[in-house]
Each structure stands twice: as C-alpha cells, then as structure tokens.
Amino acid sequence: MEATPTPADLFSEDYLVDTLDGLTVDDQQAVLASLSFSKFLKHAKVRDWCAQAKIQPSMPALRMAYNYFLFSKVGEFIGSEDVCNFFVDRVFGGVRLLDVASVYAACSQMNAHQRHHICCLVERATSSQSLNPVWDALRDGIISSSKFHWAVKQQNTSKKIFSPWPITNNHFVAGPLAFGLRCEEVVKTLLATLLHPDEANCLDYGFMQSPQNGIFGVSLDFAANVKTDTEGRLQFDPNCKVYEIKCRFKYTFAKMECDPIYAAYQRLYEAPGKLALKDFFYSISKPAVEYVGLGKLPSESDYLVAYDQEWEACPRKKRKLTPLHNLIRECILHNSTTESDVYVLTDPQDTRGQISIKARFKANLFVNVRHSYFYQVLLQSSIVEEYIGLDSGIPRLGSPKYYIATGFFRKRGYQDPVNCTIGGDALDPHVEIPTLLIVTPVYFPRGAKHRLLHQAANFWSRSAKDTFPYIKWDFSYLSANVPHSP
C-alpha cells in the first residue's frame, strides 16, 4: 500500500516546493487540497487564537485571512504572488504579518472594494477551474453553484460544505462527465463565434468568491461583454450576458437510419420548427422538456418546462400550486412568458466542414424554476452583480442577462471531414459534431433571490457552528451582507 503524503502546514516556514519534491502529481494535489479552509480553522494556531481572543470571528474577514495564509504558502509554487503582495502592500501597511490575530484584525478592517480586489486576484490565479492545483482547497467551506440548490433545500446528504470530496478528473472518456467537459468548449466557441462575434468575452474563468460574505463562490462557463483590465482582473460590463453551459449526453446520436434520435433530428434539420423540435425532444424515454399545465407544480426531473398543450406527449396528473408554493409561483411568473432561442446548425458533411447557423426560431419553452440549473444561475447572477457593483472602473447603469445554453451533439462518422471549423476556429477532431443549440433566458423576481440566498446562508451558519463549535461565531455581519435583489 502506498504511503499517504504528509499534509502541508499553512503556518510552517518550510517551502512548499520542498514539501512537494519527489511526489507524484496526484500526491501533490492531495497535499495542496490539505491546505483547505477547514484545516485552517482546525489548526492549533487558529484554535489557540479562538480560545484567547475577546472577539467573535466573522465572515468574510475570516475568509480573507485564510486567503492570505493560503497564497503566502502556495503563491510561489503556482506562479501567482499577487494575492499575498496585495495584502502586504494595501492591507497590512507594507508589513508581512505572520500571526493569526494581527492578520484577522487587519482583514476585519478591509472595505468591500479591497475584498473585491482580492477576489479578482484569486479568480485570476485559479483559471482553468478544476485543473488548477488549489481548486480543491479553495472550494472548501464555500456554497458553490452546484451545491446551492442542495443548501437551500437544507438536505443532509454526502455533499458537505466543509471538507467535501475532492474533484476527480479521471472521467471515463465515453461517459457523460467527460462528454460534458469536452463538448463545453465547443459550445463556448459557438457562443463566441456565432452569437457574439463582435463582443469582448472570456472563455476561461477561475474561482469567483463572494467579496461581500465569503461563503458563496462560482466559476462561470462563458460570458459576453466581459474583459480584463491592465492587471488581468475581470471586468463585467453592466450589460454583460452570462451563460451556464449544458451538453446533453442522452441526446447524442449516430448518423444512422436505425437510430431513432437521428430520424427525429433529420426531420428537424429539414424542416426547422416547434413541431419538429418536439418530436426530437420526445425521441428518448426521459425528455428534457416537461409539459406543465397552468397553475400546476412542475417536477424537478428536467430543466425545460412548457405551458402550451402542444408539448403534451402523454397526459400525467400534476399537483396544483398552493399557497405553500408562493416563491415557486413568483419565479414561474417571471419566466413563463419568455421563449428559448433554437439554433439548428449546418451539417459539416454538406458544407465542407464549416459549421454555422442553418436556421433559428423561437420555442415556447422556459426554465424549470425547481430544477438545480435555475439555482446555479441564480447564484452566478448574485456573484456577478457583486463584482459589477464593486468595480470602480466600469459604469453602473445596465442590466446583466443570464442564460442556459444547451448543446446537442452527434457522433462522428467516417463521412465527416477530419477538419471542421466554427467560424475561423478549428473543431477538435476527437470531439463530437454539434447539431443544435438552445438558449434559454433565466429571470429572478424581486425578493426571491434574497430569500433563497438567506436560506443558504443560514444553512452555512448552522453547518459552521456544528463543525467548529470552539469558534464563538458572529453571524450578524454575514446575515447583513447577503445581497439584496436589485
């Protein structure tokens, strides 16, 4: 049995390069993951400070203190010392502080703009998302967009807030996770090249912590009207368009007459429209669309909902919306009058490898507000709007837009050109062929976002109190800094 690598110590004077010397990549990752927020709070130096301190520690000051100690330790190794340098130069008055009490005291005096600057530097240092070496450590103690739905529902499952299971990247190449990761890049190219060719965009995001409270964090898939400043920090235009990307593995088909999905897709390709789209969706046993009659409660089974009876495939009984569902009713009212944009893409076999938009039409489909995708986008909107509000280098007027962009793909065949392009960008020859893109707008009613964020924040507080009972927490600042709806 292989020996477990020795965890690193945030407070030791040992160089991290020496600690990691001779270790495999996986063991290095395990050591870096041990530098988590939970391990920081459980460290003897932090516990001693908690026992002796006459103050009640609070967020986001504690998160900022952790960021300082973490990047003091890993900054040189990952080639990013800007986070630590900003603390020293702009928060600590030019002094490199070493003890918990002094660092926390300085962090508790930081204003929101300073915290925003730190969060932007952390985002820049963690680009490439889960492939980044400190990703596992940073997501500890954070309610991310993938955990937000669970936190709001306050379920007691294995998805922990503190000390979560590490992210694994050894996905089976033919499985849905690997499919989603490789096809996500294709959807980004479709959005940047075909839908937003003249708008500044960013294709690669790091981990965006909330500067207001330190308990929420997201990483975006794609956004238009976003640029970086001279220091490489993200700047979101108030009229930016943010996309959560999904790639539907269960709709992947082969271009063969015996494939029922292909037969339905062929009809959609030849005669684009709502009826052909419905046939395509219902070509599998568990479609991505659910018909829900007016005044009925949708299930949580999939992310698209239709009110119009033309989408009904087989009649099913639905529960009625009751006064207990007022928040759901609010969210439905804000989304049910919207429509999705459907883009049918050209077949590269017919266009010498060029993939472009063959047809575009509207479909009366809206987001299911009970589905986890809705909650993911809601949390993303909250963090993006914090960054916009705290960035002194951009105008304040504008209204960000949020979407779910869903890509549909088919398997490659021997007749497909080896070299396919989307605009001027080459398509990876090992990636499936994109066939369809559906863009669904997502809206949040006034007050609903605030209530849902408060529910998640309250759950975080209870979890922190249970996990770290020796800390005399002050949650008042946290409750006061859950963002309000605009």
Curated annotation (Swiss-Prot):
The record marks E184, D221, E244, K246 as: Required for function. GO terms for cellular component: host cell cytoplasm; host cell nucleus. GO terms for biological process: symbiont-mediated degradation of host mRNA; symbiont-mediated suppression of host gene expression. The keyword Calcium does not apply. It is an enzyme of class 3 (hydrolase). Pfam families: Viral_alk_exo. Changing K246I: Complete loss of ability to deplete cellular mRNAs. It is found in: Host nucleus; Host cytoplasm. Changing Y443A: Complete loss of ability to inhibit host AIM2 inflammasome formation without disrupting ORF37 nuclease activity. Its EC number is 3.1.-.-. Keywords: Decay of host mRNAs by virus, Early protein, Endonuclease, Eukaryotic host gene expression shutoff by virus, Exonuclease, Host cytoplasm, Host gene expression shutoff by virus, Host mRNA suppression by virus, Host nucleus, Host-virus interaction, Hydrolase, Nuclease, RNA-binding. The keyword Nuclease applies. One of its GO terms (molecular function) is RNA binding. Plays a role in processing non linear or branched viral DNA intermediates in order to promote the production of mature packaged unit-length linear progeny viral DNA molecules. Exhibits endonuclease and exonuclease activities and accepts both double-stranded and single-stranded DNA as substrate. Exonuclease digestion of DNA is in the 5'-> 3' direction and the products are 5'-monophosphate nucleosides. Additionally, forms a recombinase with the major DNA-binding protein, which displays strand exchange activity. Belongs to the herpesviridae alkaline nuclease family. Forms a complex with the DNA polymerase, the DNA polymerase processivity factor, and the major DNA binding protein. This is Shutoff alkaline exonuclease. It comes from Human herpesvirus 8 type P (isolate GK18).
